[in-house]
Structures are given as C-alpha cells and as structure tokens.
Amino acid sequence: MLPTGFLWSQSIEDVQRFSQTTYLGSARYMGAGGAFTSLGNDFSAAHQNPAGFAVFRRTELSLSLGGLNSGTSTSFKGSTRIEDLGGFNFGNIGLVLALPEENGWKWNVGMSLNKGADYTNRLTTNGETNGISRINMWMENSQGFDPDDLLDAGRVHEWMAFQSYLTDSDGEFNYSTQANIEDVNSVYTIDQKGGMNEFALLFATEKDNRWYFGGALGIPFINYTRDIVYSERFGLGDSITSFDLKEHNEISGVGFNIKLGAQYRFDNGFRAGAALHTPSWYTMEQSWEDEMFTRFNDGSVLEPITSVYSDPYTWKLSTPWRGLLGISKVFGKSGFISVDYELNAMNTARSKSDSINIDYLDQEIKAFTQLSHIVRAGAELRLNRFYLRGGYSFQTSGLNGNFEETNTNMISIGAGYRGNDLSIDFVYALRNTGQDVYFYDAQYSPSAQSDITQKPLTFTMSYRIGNR
C-alpha cells in the first residue's frame, strides 16, 4: 500500500472523457445526426429529451446492436502508425408502455438502456527523441531527496527509477544516470477499453397533441481500463540498454442524474424542444499497478520493481450541467429536417474524495476547461414504408488552448423500413477527432499528433403491440 504522499492519478483528461456523451444508440437516432431535441418516438432520443417519449403511440419494444471499428493514425517524427480495433457494439434496448388516455392527457412510462460512450482505442507511436528522455524528468524531480524518502514525497516513478538503476544518487542527493540519454528511441503504446451505458426510467405526457413534457431518472455506469507501455532504447552506454514502464489503470463508477424536457408542436409543422440535464453524480472506484523493467549490456534483465496500491480507492465526480434546444420542421408524412444546439458547461464539473487529497483536480478543471458547444443537424425522407436518413454533428473541445485537442465531427447515413407492427433500421456513422499525445508530463515530453476515428454500424429492430 502506498504512503499518503502519493500523487493520485486522476487527470483533467479523465474528467473530459467521463463528461462526454456521444449517444451511440438506436439506428434512427444516429442516422439523423442525433438532432432529436424537438422530436421523439425513439428510445435513444428519450435520453436526450424525455419529452419526446410522449410521442410513442403504442406499446413498443426495441433492440439496437451492431459493430464498432475504432481506428487511430498517429504521426511522430515524420512517420505514421495506424491501429484498428473492431468488435461488438451494443446500442440500446428499450420498452415503452402507452397508457390509456385520461382527461385529455396521454401518458407513457418505460425504461431504456443506452450506450452513451465507447472508450475502445489503441495508439502506438515511436521515434528518435535524442536528448529527450523520461530519465531527465525523474532526475530533476528527485534532486535533493534521499532515495528512501521519494515514496513519502509522492515521487513513485522516481523511486522506481532509482530502484531499477536508471538513476543514481551521490551523498548530496544529486542524481545522475548511466544510460546514454543523448541517443534515445522512444516507443509509446496506450490501449484503452470500456464505455459508458445509461439505464433510464422514463415518463412523459402529452396534452391536446401539442404540448409534450417528460422526465428521466438516469443511472449511468462506467467501466474504463487503460494500459500504457512506455519504452526507451539507448545507444551504447556504460551499462543500460533500455527500460520499459508498464502502467495499468482501472476505473469503474456508477451515478445518477435527472433529465427534464418539453416540446411544443406548432400548426405549421414546426416543432420546438428544450431539455436540461443535471450533472451525473458518480462514485468512482479506481486501482492501478505499475511495473518497470531495466535491461543491461550483458543481456540481463532486472526483475520488475512493482508499485501497487493494493486496495481500490474511491473518489467522486460531478459531471457538467447540460442544456439543449432544438427546432424541426415535419413535412406531413414525407419526412423532417431538424437542428439542435447543446451547451456543455465543462467548468461546472467537480471532484472530491473523503479519503484522498485530489484538490488539484478541481484546480485543473477551473484552469483548463471551457464551454463545449454541440450542433446537430439531421433529416429523414419517407418513401411510403421506406426511410432514408442523414445527419451531421459538430462539437468543440471542452479543454482550452493549453491542450491541443481538435473539434469533433460526425456524419451518418441510414435507412429503414416501417411496417404496421415491425420496424427495421440501420445506420453507418463516422466520428472523427484529433489531439496531441504526450508520452508523459507535457513539460518534458515530446508530443505526437493523433487522429481518432470511430465507425459504428448499428441495426435496430422494433416491435409494437396494442392500440391506444
């Protein structure tokens, strides 16, 4: 178990990751770009604006499944490495019960489990970083400390580097290295897995076929695993040829939130909608394990020096408030066009812990976050019982200029068939974002440029029963 001086591993990137919702859900929702704040009749849309849950006219059961490809192209020192991962993708499962009309009010109740985000991603890059070594940072951070005091001072990797003979100390606690850090080839690999799913209890009501109101109690849960392998290979030196640092991090969490929404239908086919999302109040459980290996000129390998916090620790995260506005034009039974705007107030996120000190994280949130703006647009064309859909969304980064993260774009195309009781829909989407990747602390580390693309293919089947 580590001493209380340890610097905990939560980061502003974790806050950004767990605060973003990409709504990987039903095929109809994704096919029209997620622009459903003023529309409804879709389970994934109910997680966005629960007022649209009142648009369902019949009891319905729906299931969305498919596949997801995650690709990364990373450029460093003139070379590019490409990684591709593919696998199964759950989108949504939902049930709505259309209750009998009472006194002019129509009520729907139900539940839905929706995919909110997918964290699956792998990134690999390598290249010459001559004169720039992680050992430089470890030596600088160790200066003035007795090696036996490094752990108590929270300098875990510095302690591991000393124990692994990557650094050495003289009697005055000045640190040096036997590695040839003027001739360095660095290799960086990060493998991320997991996602966020949200279970919601939904209710909605409709009055006079004009006003729609709804609410949702959301229970999101997160599973996230990150494995990083960072290696340096040195030219000829006194004794050290290379080292590997392996970092394993696991985070799981469950929370709750409340969503409220309203919609209004005008006589001329226009519809307007608005929704407010409270923060998701998460309780996170986290654990990690690091290993360091050192290789020497004689071919020997030092047994790994392992640093483990043996018991998982907990911390709390409150994600940002979110506000949504939408307007759409419905062309009778021919289709619709729709536009949404969403404001994600990243600077309202907060963190705390009763057992560890993570005050620095709120300071980073205040210093490095900004408002994130999302615009979604979509259209649906009806051809008798067949439907064609297209959509686009644009999102600005919630991190300010201190982080080189580009805006996120997503385009989608889809189609569907709607019978009397059975509907089948599919969608293919492409979501792209970019960011600078630092191998370690940005103050010391070289950076690579990464382009990340997600390509979900989702099928939805819905079955309706009864009549209202």
Place the predicted regions along the sequence by residue:
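N-terminal targeting signals for Sec/Tat export/insertion, comprising classic cleavable signal peptides
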Residues: 20-38
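Short structured motifs
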Residues: 48-49, 445
